[in-house]
Amino acid sequence: MVPAMAAAHDNATRTAPVIEDPAVWDDNAEQVLSALEKQFASYGMTLTAKEGYPYLLAVNNAGGTVTVYTVDAATGRYAVPFMAMVCSGGADTPTGYFSTPVDYSWRLLMGPSYGQYATRIYSSYLFHSVPYYSQHKDDVEYDEFNKLGTIASLGCIRLAVVDVKWIYDNCPLGTPVVIYNDKENPGPMGKPGTIYTDPADTEKRGWDPTDPDPANPWDDSFESGTAIRSQAAWDQWEDEREGWMKSLTPTDLQGWSTDSKIEGTRG
């Protein structure tokens, strides 16, 4: 088992991952992406890579999975499965083809609640962490964390901190995003598992287990989360750890948000 797949299995303490054979990832991706390009042609969707934008984010709302595709150097098209991350969307999550316009280290959400490493997709819909009761990293809504992988949000796309921070750090504003629904097929790499946080564990329950903050009481092994990574993604994870730690939001307070009003933001 390659390291990425081993991590996906070992960290999945709530639901087990369903991982497709890496030998068929590319063929699976061709089928999925071809269908999406046709389905969302009226939105202007194209698989031709945008210069300066190495990734396409494909959100399968019904399947609870975000699959990241990178560029096939031979064709210049988004085609290569890079990583799959478990997510929670909502009944009101829109489908379509979009590009990201703005991001926030912390973002005030409906409730009110707060999300880390938020990136706007379209209108009031964002990628963000599982919501927090307050703008403190030890105050996550732990019951909501245990819903990852299911329909649970008010329309935004929730992810574990490790995954949403990857988007925040690696996907420049303007990154293409397609949102669709396919309950039967989560994506070409499969569907990642999920981590269980015990509501009775008062020491750990307030933390997202994957938050790389040194104050996190969870074991460091959970930092890689449950994402299904290609070897290229796993190599990136190892190579970029130093920079990854440098971009942490403050443990206890206020990250910067340039647009922090509740109106127009889901959860």
Language-model features: where?
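Sec-dependent signal peptide cleavage junction
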Residues: 1-15
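Low-complexity, intrinsically disordered/propeptide-like segments
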Residues: 4, 8, 39, 248-251, ...
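Intrinsic-disorder/low-complexity regions
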Residues: 9-10, 20, 59
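A general sequence property marking short-to-moderate contiguous segments
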Residues: 18-44
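Intrinsic-disorder/low-complexity loop/linker signature
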Residues: 30, 75-76, 190
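Gly/Pro-biased beta-strand-loop elements
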Residues: 35-140, 238-239
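Exported/periplasmic cell-wall-interacting domains
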Residues: 107-267
